[in-house]
């Protein structure tokens, strides 16, 4: 009997357009005109230094605790994400794997998934994604592929990872384990350009 393919899919930056919500929330409170393309790295404390300078609160805390409702609950889904998610379910088991900083953020993630039509039955909140032994990991954070134990790494494009070279995220500890590494503009593009054309292994 053929083993079922398992897709591990991240939430933020893959299903949920958190970046857009963060930038809009920041601009609203700081009367600024920053764009998503200005977010040059994953660590928001370095991208939004004005927050700590003017409030004394680190940007990560400001976004993910003080303004978590605007950032997490009010975020829109990434374009085509739900259709792609449902499409992947026809090819294997899809689990949602995400690191959420606080218990409140985890609850907000579950509420958001349910509100936007995603299932909440197979959700795993996990900081260390090297513990995953799935066929695919689909993520926007290149660090989650370091020392990975997945067979196929799929990096979803974002302004903060556009300068990342694909093979730079693989090191000697996992180069023999990983079968393929690729990048796509979105989960929808991965589904339409790769999965539908027989790329699933």
Feature names for model-found ranges:
Residues 67-96, 104-107:
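Short, acidic loop-to-helix structural element flanking the phosphoryl-transfer center
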Residues 93-95, 136, 154:
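A structural signal for isolated positions on well-ordered beta-strands in alpha/beta enzyme cores
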Residues 1-57:
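Active-site neighborhood of HAD-like aspartate-dependent phosphohydrolases
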Residues 34, 45-80:
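Metal-dependent phosphoesterase signature
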Residues 112-126, 169-195:
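Structural recognition of alpha->loop->beta junctions
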Residues 138-182:
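Acidic, Mg2+-coordinating phosphoryl-transfer loop and its flanking beta/alpha structural elements
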Residues 99-147:
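Substrate-recognition "cap/lid" segment bordering the active-site pocket of phosphatases
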């Amino acid at each position: 009997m053929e083993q079922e393919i398992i897709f591990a899919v991240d939430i933020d930056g893959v299903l949920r357009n958190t970046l857009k919500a963060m930038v809009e929330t920041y601009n609203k409170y700081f009367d600024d005109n920053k764009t998503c393309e200005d977010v040059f790295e994953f660590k928001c404390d370095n991208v939004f230094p004005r927050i700590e300078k003017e409030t004394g609160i680190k940007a990560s805390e400001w976004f993910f605790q003080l303004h978590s409702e605007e950032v997490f609950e009010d975020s829109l889904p990434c374009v085509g994400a739900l259709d792609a998610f449902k499409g992947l379910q026809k090819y294997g088991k899809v689990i949602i794997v995400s690191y959420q900083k606080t218990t409140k953020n985890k609850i907000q993630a579950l509420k958001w998934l349910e509100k936007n039509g995603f299932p909440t039955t197979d959700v795993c909140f996990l900081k260390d994604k090297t513990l995953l032994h799935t066929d695919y990991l689909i993520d926007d954070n290149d660090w989650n592929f370091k020392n990975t134990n997945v067979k196929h790494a799929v990096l979803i494009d974002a302004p903060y990872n556009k300068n990342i070279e694909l093979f730079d995220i693989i090191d000697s500890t996992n180069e023999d384990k990983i079968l393929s590494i690729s990048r796509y503009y979105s989960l929808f593009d991965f589904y339409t350009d790769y999965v539908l054309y027989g790329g699933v292994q």
